[in-house]
A protein has these predicted regions:
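Helix-terminus/linker motif at the lipid-water interface of multi-pass membrane proteins
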Residues: 34, 38-56, 125-132, 188-199, ...
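Residue-level hotspots within pore-lining transmembrane alpha-helices
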Residues: 35, 39, 68-72, 112, ...
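Small-residue hotspots at the loop-to-helix junctions and early N-terminal turns
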Residues: 52-63, 142, 205, 277-292, ...
Length: 471
């Protein structure tokens, strides 16, 4: 690794304007996440031309895919945190070793998930109540996606490592390039052309698999040649007990956190479906809008994790605290503004996704009016969660997720919708109430962080002295 590159990137994040540093990291991450959502939009566009069964096949597969991905996402959280702290502490060799260890673990972890997912796919689809006419399409799509999860995990880990080192432009460019390729390959593999056979709905999965493979190889080459201040050495891929323990200790709670959200979403869907088709459709529309709205908050959360991690590693605890506070305030203001603007135009926004469906628009507009003003509270939580992860407090974010989903939101939604006169409105009210309570709880935990005891590099067998700028 070039120490000059590492020093330049790290110094830019350890000094000067915090706001400029947040924008420098956050904006490219936001753009990359928006592009990543383009995969889903492109697949939906072309698969939609195969008919409703093909569209339903992708829809019913998404919860399973999300759950499988959740099982491995903790490794990327651990990678970002440990690399950021090592870079901030000028422990460049250890940053390289962490990168190699996390990438290796992601590959090893993905293999049993891919094998189990392939053989359990029929059972999981039946468990979700997949209709018989949709089942063969869903099975072919799901098996291809699950079989190639090694590439999805691989690129996810590599871009997380780069972000931990402060490099966000290259993952953005790789995502943009593979998105363009996916847009070209989707119609070719779905409908066939010349010697290329028509794979139908499975063609969309094959295109995604190929492009994720290309993205992983590109990311690996970037890190192999040390172009971003971080370098993966193949000789460092042999598991090291202390590093593996640190990665698992940080990563496991993060995986449980995401699984809690995934299962919580399924639990909410169970409540919603019992209230009628129109309510279910309205819920689905608003939840999809929510997923798009929180993209800026995801970017701020990742930027916060990178900046806080590097500053904690460098021993700049007060700057790290200031980063968390400013990031939380910015996320709150931006998402609050988005929510309030959305309220004004909510009937038109909901109507775009549910044209000529007045009851869906009515329910969706009411739901949106209640949840949108609380978007800022979601942004605040996500930003501070980035600070928790950067200081190794993934257990805190896990507990907050479990409390939010299973002790507050779902019981509240059930009670208000079934045992009060609110009815359907009770379901909607559960969201802003939960957001308010969890924002307060998150702030309380953040203000109790002991910043002087947030360094994790000692657990890796690191020397207490800074390593020379050579690797």
């Amino acid at each position: 690794m070039s120490p000059e590159i590492a020093n330049e990137k790290s110094n830019a994040l350890l000094q000067g304007s915090i706001l400029r540093s947040l924008a420098k990291i956050g904006v490219p991450v936001i753009l990359a996440n928006l592009l990543q959502s383009g995969y889903i939009m492109i697949d939906a566009f072309w698969v939609g031309r195969l008919g409703d069964k093909a569209v339903a096949a992708i829809s019913v597969s998404q919860p399973i895919i999300f759950l499988a991905f959740a099982l491995g996402i903790g490794l990327s959280v651990a990678g970002t945190t440990l690399v950021a702290q090592c870079i901030g502490a000028r422990l460049y060799q250890q940053a390289n070793d962490i990168a190699a260890q996390v990438f290796t673990l992601s590959i090893l972890f993905s293999i049993p998930i891919a094998v189990a997912g392939y053989f359990l796919a029929p059972w999981m689809l039946h468990a979700l109540g997949t209709q018989n006419e949709v089942f063969p399409y869903a099975l072919s799509f799901l098996r291809v996606i699950i079989s190639g999860i090694i590439f999805t995990f691989g690129f996810s880990m590599l871009q997380s490592l780069m972000r931990g080192a402060g490099e966000v432009r290259i993952p953005l460019l790789i995502t943009l390039g593979t998105l363009i390729l996916n847009a070209i390959m989707d119609p070719l593999l779905i409908f066939g052309y010349g010697i290329i056979p028509a794979f139908g709905v499975a063609g969309a999965a094959i295109a995604t698999l190929i492009n994720q493979g290309i993205a992983m190889i590109a990311g690996l080459l970037v890190l192999r040649f040390g172009r971003v201040g971080l370098k993966i050495y193949f000789r460092a891929m042999r598991p090291k007990v202390e590093m593996v323990k640190s990665v698992v200790r940080l990563g496991m709670p993060a995986s449980i956190e995401l699984c809690a959200h995934a299962l919580g979403a399924s639990g909410m869907m169970t409540l919603v479906t019992g209230l009628g088709t129109d309510v279910t459709a309205a819920y689905g529309v608003v939840i999809n809008i929510n997923a798009l709205v929180i993209v800026p908050a995801i970017g701020m959360s990742i930027a916060t994790a990178t900046l806080v991690g590097q500053n904690v590693g460098a021993g700049q605890s007060e700057r790290a605290r200031a980063i968390g506070r400013l990031s939380g305030a910015i996320s709150f203001l931006i998402l609050t503004a988005i929510g309030l603007i959305g309220v004004v135009f909510s009937p038109y926004i909901i109507g775009t996704f549910a044209p000529d469906q007045p009851m869906v628009i009515a329910h969706g507009t009411h739901f949106f009016h209640l949840i949108a003003p609380s978007y800022g509270l979601i942004g605040l939580q996500m930003a501070l969660n980035g600070a928790f992860r950067a200081t190794g407090r993934t257990m805190t974010t896990m507990v907050l997720a479990l409390v939010s989903q299973w002790l507050i939101q779902i019981p509240l939604a059930w009670g208000l919708s079934h045992y009060t006169s609110l009815g359907v409105s009770g379901l909607w009210w559960a969201f802003p109430i939960t957001n308010l309570l969890m924002a307060g709880l998150t702030i309380m935990f953040f203000e109790r962080i002991d910043w002087q005891r947030s360094t994790l590099t000692h657990s890796l067998g690191a020397s207490s002295e800074k390593q020379p700028d050579t690797v």
